[in-house]
Amino acid sequence: MPDPMRSYLDFEKPVAELDSKVDELRAMAASGTDIGEEVSRIEEKAGQALADLYANLTPWQKTMVARHPQRPHFTDFVNALITEFTPLAGDRKFGEDAALLGGFGRFRGEPICVMGQEKGATTESRLKHNFGMARPEGYRKAVRLMEMAERFGLPVLSLVDSAGAYPGIGAEERGQAEAIARSTDACLALGVPNVAIITGEGMSGGAIALTTANKVLMLEHAIYSVISPEAASSILWRDGTKAQEAANSMKITAQDMLRFGVVDTILKEPVGGAHRDPAAMIAATGDAIAQAFDELKGLDAAAIRKQRRQKFIEIGRKLS
C-alpha cells in the first residue's frame, strides 16, 4: 500500500498505484526475495510518472494541489524560519481571530513582523482556525501589527493561504469589507519593506488584504484569484459542479500571475508539490524571502512607498 500518511489527489491515481507496487515489492524483499532491481525500476518509473504529471498540470489540478491538506501552512513556515517568535492576539476592538496569526520574531537574525492565515492541519485545528478564513478582527489585528512594525522600523512578511475572508453574518455585521479595505490600505501605506508570499490559495479580498506588498512571491502550484472556482461556477453557470471549467478559464495560476505582472517571482516546488517535501519547500522559501528583502535594502520610507505604488499602477496598465 502507498504511504498511509500521504493523501493522494484524484489525478495522482497512476502514481499511487506505482507507489503501492513498490511497497509490495519491498515487503517481499524483506522476506528474503532478491528483487532489488525490480524495486529500483518501479521506483524510477513512479518518479518519472510524477514528474511528467506535475509538468503538465491543468489550472484545476493546480487548485487541488494548492488545497492539499499536507501542504506547509503558516505555522510550519514560522516554526522553521522565525526564531524568538512572539505572537500577538486581538484587534483591541472586538476580540481574537485564530484564522489570521501574527507576531514578531527574527528572520536570519534580523527582527521582523510576520502574519498570515493558518488553515490548520487536523479537524480540531481547522475548526479552531476557521479553515484560514479570517473575520474582521483578524484583518484589524493585521493592521495593528503593521502599525507596530512601522513604529519600530521592522520589515513585514505576509504568508497568504486562504479560500477567502469569512462571509458569515456576524463578520458582515462587524464590517468585513471595511476591515479588508483598511488592511489593504495599511499594506500600501507602509513606510517599511513588505514581502508577501502566496503559499497555497490566494482568494478574493481575503488575500489582497495582505498581498499589496513591495514584493509578491508565489509558489509554483499556488493559485490567486478574485473568487474561487466554485463560487465563479455558481455565479456564471448557476451550477457549482462546473468549478473545473471555471478554474481552467479564470487565469489563476502562478504562471498567469507572473505573465500579468501581479507577482514578481515564482518559487519552484519539489517534484510532486510542496506537500511531498515540506522541509525543502520551506528552506527554498526562506532563501527567496531573504533575497526579496535584500533587494529593498537601502530604500527610505518615501522610496519604499513609491516603489510599491508604481508596482500596482503597472499591473493596471499591463491588464488594460
Swiss-Prot record:
Domain CoA carboxyltransferase C-terminal residues, every copy: 41-295
Cellular component GO terms held in the UniProt record: acetyl-CoA carboxylase complex
Molecular functions (GO terms): acetyl-CoA carboxylase activity; ATP binding; carboxyl- or carbamoyltransferase activity
Enzyme kind, highest EC tier: transferase
Gene3D superfamilies: 2-enoyl-CoA Hydratase, Chain A, domain 1
Subunit structure: Acetyl-CoA carboxylase is a heterohexamer composed of biotin carboxyl carrier protein (AccB), biotin carboxylase (AccC) and two subunits each of ACCase subunit alpha (AccA) and ACCase subunit beta (AccD).
Protein's UniProt name: Acetyl-coenzyme A carboxylase carboxyl transferase subunit alpha
Record organism: Bradyrhizobium sp. (strain ORS 278)
